[in-house]
Amino acid sequence: IVKGCFADDPFLFERQAAGVPAYSDTYWNNKPQNMEANRQRIFEHTRPQFIRCWHDVAYNSDALVACLYEYWLCYKTPRFAKRLHYIPLPMEIPHESSARIKGMGRTIKVLVGIQPKRDYLKGAKRIASFVESVARRHPDKIEIKYIEGVPYDEYMHMLDEADVLVDQLYSYTPSMNSLAAMARGTVVI
């Protein structure tokens, strides 16, 4: 049995409350954040029947596999360390010449992908507010484009054109968005 350590589970919430990792979508500087937005999510994953199911799988698995560093960090405890493995998310380079130097001698194109119902989990708007302040000081040098709800192929084309992608604040590890951007030579913040 292999247990995937991916995002929401009662152990991750427990570890986040204990300050591991140092910041997350539920805790920042050892203080709860976004708790109202996270209330239903945390409730669902900390119900007794969910905890029993998680416990049965976690304690009876042959291996635990984390795909993000922060999940690996949460599970790196004496009770799980010997069975814990880290397998990062894959990065696919779309075509050989896709990674290139961008933004040379022209306006820097910044792409901000927003999932309105999930931004409290990601924190992209927090980063974007800093980019906006830089753009206000240098309006002729930075162009910010906010997008949401576009088809995947269109989004990949936008990544090809972007110089910078604003991605997740609360993740220690590059997400699939970040990896797709970096494969195209796009800087990720």
What are these regions (language model features)?
Residues 1-4, 15-16, 56, 60, ...:
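Glycosyltransferases and closely related glycan-assembly transferases
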Residues 58, 159-160, 182:
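A short, aliphatic-rich alpha-helical micro-motif
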Residues 160-173, 186-187:
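Acidic donor-binding loop of glycosyltransferase active sites
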Residues 156, 178-183:
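Short alpha-helical segment that forms part of, or immediately flanks, the ligand-binding pocket
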Residues 55-60, 64-66, 71-91:
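Helix-loop-beta element that forms the nucleotide-linked donor phosphate-binding surface
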Residues 23-64:
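Membrane-proximal helix-turn-helix segments that form the acceptor-binding/catalytic region
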Residues 2-27, 96, 189:
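Short, solvent-exposed beta-strand-terminating loops
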Residues 73-74, 83-152:
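Conserved catalytic-core segment of nucleotide-activated headgroup transferases in glycan assembly
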